[in-house]
Amino acid sequence: MPALVLIGAQWGDEGKGKATDLLGGAVDYVVRYQGGNNAGHTVVIGEERYALHLIPSGILRADCVPVIGNGVVIDPGVLLTEMDGLAARGIDVSRLLISANAHLIMPHHRALDRVTERYLGKARIGTTGRGIGPTYGDKVARTGIRVQDLLDPGIFRKKLELALREKNQVLAKVYNRRRIEVDEVVEEYAAYAERLGPHIADTGLVLDRALREGKVVLLEGSQGTLLDVDHGSYPFVTSSNPTAGYAATGAGIGPTRINRVVGIIKAYTTRVGAGPFPTELDDKVGEELRRIGGEFGVTTGRARRTGWFDAVIARYAVRVNGLTDLFLTKLDVLSGFDRVPICVGYDIGGERVDEMPMTQTEFHHARPIYTELPGWQEDLSDVRKYADLPAAAKDYIRTLEELSGAPVSAIGVGPGRDQTLVINDLV
């Protein structure tokens, strides 16, 4: 069986956890392929709410194997806390597999992330301060420490000593911060190694064998397309590639294994942190969207910026990811609005632009051009069939499909596992 990719089509927080959980019943493996604990998924099952930061949502399905791929950067302390929290709630975490090639977030990464962000002042990017960027930086610089190094204490110490020789100079002499002691870190990470050792595997090999046996593999990205370090609103992006092109690399499988790419897209738009946001609403309407939609970060608790649906970035996401389907989430949040605007293009210096601007300067100056559709008053939270949606809601969905260039195959009308309308089977 081929693999499928599930990615965010906006600035993250689109509802990927809900989508992954829905598909989890039809897949055998769920693989997280990039990012770290700087993003979170929320899954609601009955009265239970699960906030996941590193572990794939497939952990909540008893017959699914969750995998943390080589493209992820891992804070082992955070991972163990998450595992313990799930275990305390009766979730079997013994199935979790961790790629030996994934990189470790170290104390010096967190320290440097926090201090450099403060140093930037008003020019800061809005990092979560969890060490994600510095870890990816060391990975590319070939000075990182990988999960497999936990299995060899001698190699781990040697790599750590080499890293701290430089990092402590920067912390102490540039930022006037305390040096990090090698022995303290070695002791801390030795405890992590003891607990995580049984979960470490050659996950690329595991997944290849699974695919050859006809198993279904779901590749789950974190964050979203517009936060991609190459294709996002740079420099206000994450330090990895959430887009579909990286899914194979970050999971350790060949790209020809993938035959479907599903983009999760919210019925309106949100983003966290600094950076351009053409449809942002700095008024009571924006506050209302935030309140009704519960737009506060799972990981940071920060209030998300809110705005109307932006068809320009939707088209862009379809293009750069090769999206075959859209999973539209939070349609229920738009109930009660008399009119629902959709951004169909940008005004940049008096010129209309219908595609993503080539430069970030142009994107920064983009002003939305709206078309307005009639809204609907009905509560959608109990709707379970597409045919039962209000006519205005159906018109809204059809318009989004036409403007984005991809079909809507599933619709979320609430946070619950059962609050999803499936139009086309995704697996």
Swiss-Prot record:
Native source species: Frankia alni (strain DSM 45986 / CECT 9034 / ACN14a)
Keyword Zinc-finger: no
Subunit structure: Homodimer.
Pathway: Purine metabolism; AMP biosynthesis via de novo pathway; AMP from IMP: step 1/2
GO CC annotations, alphabetized: cytoplasm
The EC number(s) this enzyme carries: 6.3.4.4
Protein name (Swiss-Prot/TrEMBL): Adenylosuccinate synthetase
Pfam families cross-referenced by the UniProt entry: Adenylsucc_synt
Enzyme class: ligase
Family matches, as HAMAP family: Adenylosucc_synth
Alphabetical list of NCBIfam families matching this protein: PRK01117.1, purA
An example Gene Ontology molecular-function term: GTP binding
Entries under SUPFAM superfamilies matching the protein: P-loop containing nucleoside triphosphate hydrolases
Chain's gene name: purA
Superkingdom of the organism of origin: Bacteria
Residues reported in the UniProt entry to bind Mg(2+): 13, 40
Catalysed reactions listed for this entry: IMP + L-aspartate + GTP = N(6)-(1,2-dicarboxyethyl)-AMP + GDP + phosphate + 2 H(+)
Free-text remark on how the cofactor is bound: Binds 1 Mg(2+) ion per subunit.
UniProt cross-references to Gene3D superfamilies, sorted A to Z: Adenylosuccinate Synthetase, subunit A, domain 1, Adenylosuccinate Synthetase, subunit A, domain 2, Adenylosuccinate Synthetase, subunit A, domain 3
